[in-house]
Regions:
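Short acidic, hydrophobic short linear motifs in intrinsically disordered regions
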Residues: 23, 32-42
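A short, conserved structural fragment
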Residues: 58-70
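Hydrophobic structural patches
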Residues: 26-27
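Short alpha-helical segments that sit at the start of domains
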Residues: 1-22
Length: 122
């Protein structure tokens, strides 16, 4: 079994938004090739959110998109598949905790960027 810390690291590094996690779980739950339009309809999301999520999930090695633009769940490794399973379990049991992990990971980059412009007294 994978440790909670490994799952937390995986969630923070793999999902730029909660939407990305929702897209992945949809593709995992209904294993078939999906067009972006079908994902938009199923999740009631925007085209932009879905295209960014699919791109990020592909970069993370969790989905593949064919030449026709259809995307399906296909983790690059057994370890990645196991981490997805654990992330799904954690999200089902503690959705707020998972949302905080994702939001804190994305906002830490913003905080660092903002800090670069903070005026300091010398």
């Amino acid at each position: 079994m994978t440790s909670r810390e490994q799952v937390s690291r995986f969630i923070r590094s793999s999902f730029r938004s909660v939407w990305s996690l929702e897209v992945l779980l949809l593709l995992k739950r209904e294993r078939r090739p999906w067009t972006d339009a079908e994902i938009v309809t199923a999740l009631r999301a925007s085209d932009l959110i879905v295209s960014q999520s699919v791109s990020a999930l592909g970069d993370a090695g969790l989905v593949v998109t064919d030449a026709a633009g259809r995307t399906e769940y296909r983790p690059a490794s057994e370890d990645a598949a196991r981490l997805v399973e654990e992330a799904e379990r954690l999200y089902a049991g503690s959705p707020d905790a998972v949302r905080r992990l994702i939001l804190n990971a994305s906002s830490s980059g913003l905080a660092a960027f903002a800090d670069a412009f903070r005026l300091r007294k010398d």
